[in-house]
Amino acid sequence: MRSLPSLIAFLIVYLIIPPARAQSFYGSGVQEVRVEIPFKDWDYKLDSMKKANGEARILGTAWVNGLRFDSAGIRYKGNSSYFRTRNETYKKLPFNIKLDYKIKSQKMPEGQKTVKLSNAFLDPSFVRDPLAYEIIRQYMPAPLCNFTRYYVNNKYYGLYINTESIDENFLEKHFGTSEGYVIKCDPDNWKRVRSQTGCPKGENASLAYLNDNFGCYDAFYEVDDPGAWKYLLQLIKVLNKNTDKIETVLDVDQTLWMLALNNVLVNLDSYNGSLSHNYYLWVDTTGVCHPLIWDLNMAFGGWRRNFSFEEMKDDEIIQYQPLAEIDNNKRPLIAKLLRNSYYRKIYLAHFKTIVNDYLKSGKYLSRAQDMMREIDPWVKLDSLKLYGYDDFQNSLEKTMHTGPDHVIGIRQLMDKRTQWLLKHPLLNKVQPEISDVKHAPDASDIKITAKIVNATNGWLMYRSDRMFAFTRTRMYDDGTHGDATADDGLYTAKVAAEMAKHYYIAAEGSEGAATLPERASFEYFETKPAAKKKQ
């Protein structure tokens, strides 16, 4: 038997899987939002405000699932989803409702203060946003998203997509703090002009380096505080000029997940695509930037314009390459990171995990069908929807035509893409195998070991708190560095105990890479002392 002291000192490995945070307004079922606006010409007023100043609001009363919010601020939101919809004379426009606009104490029971309602622009299925967010939340922090019945002055304006804001409440929930800065890499006003003249052209929020003047970037990025510009420019300079130091300014693993998710789901209205937008950067208190995906109504091939703004053919999006844009210096997050052998192997491991979890298993399709069954009655009643009811019913299997665009059916795209990806040589590389992960105290340090085979390098990824990115340090199988026996496949690393509250293992082989847990860094191991025995 172990002695009592050793039992007390022993540390148990806990696998941490972030819990599904089902919240009433963002939970299952169709929600309800009502607003009362005291103007007959409220739509004209909102249009005028949107064109003059995208942030201006009119006052109204809002009811969210029956809860009343007085003096709420109401405005239209969106770029293409507003301007193109309005130009085509449709009345179903996207809304932003700020519940605490005048009464700062007002918020929903779960803490949210803003309601963001999208109009399913270029999505006859209505499910692209909620389905893509549901998938993404298994691998990185991302907003909750569901469906809402929306009424203005007691008139049913249709079924809307309801997406959680990336705000202080979101940051507290996922990172345990709202300190730091938030950078929106897609300003609400897409017509804004840079404050500095004589700048290089630039290309939206691509993180390409232009020069050291903040005024050359402020048409492409929107900051919540002027102090954020320093950290954005620091990221841009390191990414483009000193990539070896990128882990000091960027949560690289979360970035690799974002890039892989955009690619697998053919979400090209994103950083990966021709417009290079629709994401946020949260800058933590150490100056490290964490990317967050936003706006997924054109995932699953809904946006298919290439870098020449020509519409891509079906085969081009079905066979959208896993390493697309690796040679495109206008997308440095892709080009700079994926040209690094280690990062590329980890990216492909993440890519394969997503394919196996949601495409190969068919889970993406079953969830899409579940969602469509749930909302069917409300879509049918929606007289202002941007597509016909038949378009909704056929949107999984058939391509819908809307203006100059062809919106491919979700299943029509993803079933063929799944079969093509499963045969792709990049997803059939030999990967290392990781098992038998353990940790134990070693004086003021903690020693972490793992069995790794088919690997050339083992890495310990660790951090002291969930607000931080993981730090990488090498694990050894050489009989030194705390490793007992050389070349036995048991890799070891030691770090200061207070710095390794969370950790996971990464391994790199000659062909591929692997992590344990497989969904790391979103899932990870945690060190905790064993409970003491009662005397």
Placement of each model-derived feature along the sequence:
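Phosphate/dinucleotide-binding and metal-coordinating scaffold of catalytic cores
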Residues: A22-S444, V453-A469, G509-L516, F525-Q535
